């Protein structure tokens, strides 16, 4: 019943992976998980705790004694999706506990759905468990349920998100994450490594490192070193790379020390992939966002990174139609894209978020203008993507297999994160492949966002 990615319907989402089947009479809980990968990790933690306490995990509404809805509250559209999911869970099951980012506004939820059993905010794991205990008392089997359990996973067996911190110290005017999740709170590096080691030992082939600001990891704890591991993103990346799995870094801000990561990518210790939220390119727009405004220096930094690691893939997200954005400022963004030649981009039309300081800015952009700019931005980025992928035809690339069916094997290259980037499809000679395999392919064809290829002959 969990959603991964967030645009999947709950009834189409993958089932949680469990270590043992439910037993007769065991109380069961369902989970609907909305929002970003960081919220998905929260859902996994909750389910793991419940599983260890003796609860079964139901993949459908009918089999659950109660349902937890882990909400997203970042944008108005996300709030609407969360309210819809809560309503569906109430209609299908009737016993619903709400948690997550939208839970920071309990009156907003109970005003729309007064019959929910409880509302808790983000990261309030104990309160969620208390609400479950009150609604569905646990009934553990002391010989099975309370043994140390492998964590419940809502992703396929071969990749896993690894959350290294909570919260954020940035004060971007369009964002309310610090209000919902607080300031940066890094995990001890040794705790992150212990989790990563367990994941790899259990068959995970790819670790996706996530947080609100991955490059700030350890700043709040003064980069403390404990048990042989230092809380700094460069040290952590090096340590993770030693485990032998693919390591992919998400949500990295372009601080100067990020350049220390690039040699690790050039040496193959971590994947040559950076997910960096640039958001815009015009300095005046960036200042109105309360973000770093050195777009020209960013281009120089990108060039320096690529000089060290030519295979580096850069992904980013942008906002168009931000309050006050002029046509000239938007054109600067398009020109910057031409120069930066980013491999993967996402783009959002600005919308007000309750509590965000950007709401009060003057000169909001009309909806039709935002839509037009979004269309032009996506056309530009599509052209760049298509040209970059065309250059990969006839190359040999290493890929990880995500799914296999009768028609094709769906894979990803090192340049593709799950759910948000493209795929490489093998539609012939894929019968012996299975999810999690890492194989070499020859690229035969390229599209706008995806590749097609065949297994490369063994040397």
Curated annotation (Swiss-Prot):
Residues 390-457 form the TRAM domain. It catalyses: L-aspartate(89)-[ribosomal protein uS12]-hydrogen + (sulfur carrier)-SH + AH2 + 2 S-adenosyl-L-methionine = 3-methylsulfanyl-L-aspartate(89)-[ribosomal protein uS12]-hydrogen + (sulfur carrier)-H + 5'-deoxyadenosine + L-methionine + A + S-adenosyl-L-homocysteine + 2 H(+). Residues 154-387 form the Radical SAM core domain. Its EC number is 2.8.4.4. It comes from the Bacteria. One of its GO terms (cellular component) is cytosol. Its cofactor is [4Fe-4S] cluster. InterPro entries: Elp3/MiaA/NifB-like_rSAM, Methylthiotransferase, Methylthiotransferase_N, Methylthiotransferase_N_sf, NA-bd_OB-fold, Ribosomal_uS12_MeSTrfase_RimO, rSAM, rSAM_horseshoe. Signal peptide: none annotated. It holds the Pfam family UPF0004. [4Fe-4S] cluster 2 binds at residues 168, 172, 175. It is found in: Cytoplasm. Residues 1-28 are annotated as: Disordered. Residues 27-137 form the MTTase N-terminal domain. One of its GO terms (biological process) is tRNA modification. [4Fe-4S] cluster 1 binds at residues 36, 72, 101. One of its GO terms (molecular function) is aspartic acid methylthiotransferase activity. Keywords: 4Fe-4S, Cytoplasm, Iron, Iron-sulfur, Metal-binding, S-adenosyl-L-methionine, Transferase. It is an enzyme of class 2 (transferase). Binds 2 [4Fe-4S] clusters. One cluster is coordinated with 3 cysteines and an exchangeable S-adenosyl-L-methionine. Catalyzes the methylthiolation of an aspartic acid residue of ribosomal protein uS12. Belongs to the methylthiotransferase family. RimO subfamily. This is Ribosomal protein uS12 methylthiotransferase RimO. The gene is rimO.
